[in-house]
Amino acid sequence: MHRGYDFFRPDYLCIGTEVNEIYRDGGPQKWNAYAALHQQTYQELKKEHPDLPIFASCTLPQAFQQRGGMLAAFQKLMPYNDLVAISYYPFFVPEKDRLAALDWLPAQFDSFQKPYAMVETNDLAERLPFPKSKHIVLDGTPAKQRAYYEKLLALAQEKRFVFVISFIHQDYDALWERIKDSAPELFIAWRDCGLLDERGRARPAYDVWKAALNLPLQE
């Protein structure tokens, strides 16, 4: 970790990605082991870099409102996180909850009085049947993608997010054709999430993104 810092000199340092899934997949015992490691790593790094924002991210899962144990476990880690760092993919969430998750988020984390960051996000802009798992269909549209980015970026402006990372800039249809025989089928889920389509044409959400970038910088 120290060598990585010395090489990259980052403005922010993420020491764990979507770590709440450790609780989901491994239960409290594995989570407690991770939490001890995270706490020690955070404290040691802070001794040398007291002004560097250090954090681990969590993901908003599909049934985010029913994951009370996972939420409570991550909240206990917040004294050792300098940001509330979230990754979120609304196309995995039921229609009635996909935008509501952005209202749920500050209700759970505002009390920590720490800056927010969206470390990974995008939304699906096309209807996507999984080619092998034919019972799985993700129902994306350009309008739903635009509505998501409008709500997300309005929240980011309101809460003064330190950054928002849109994970896919352009659809990767060509890449998928090259890797589809060897990659997990799940990887197709993000194929059509670009602000630009596979031909480089801007989707409506692109205008929302550019408008947010053109807002005056607030110190």
Predicted regions and their residues:
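The substrate-binding groove and active-site-proximal loops of carbohydrate-active enzymes
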Residues: V19-N32, S87-K96, I136-A143, C193-G200
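Active-site cradle of extracellular carbohydrate-active enzymes
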Residues: L37, E44-E48, L52-A63, Y80
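Active-site groove signature of glycoside hydrolases
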Residues: M1-W31, F55-S57, V162-D171
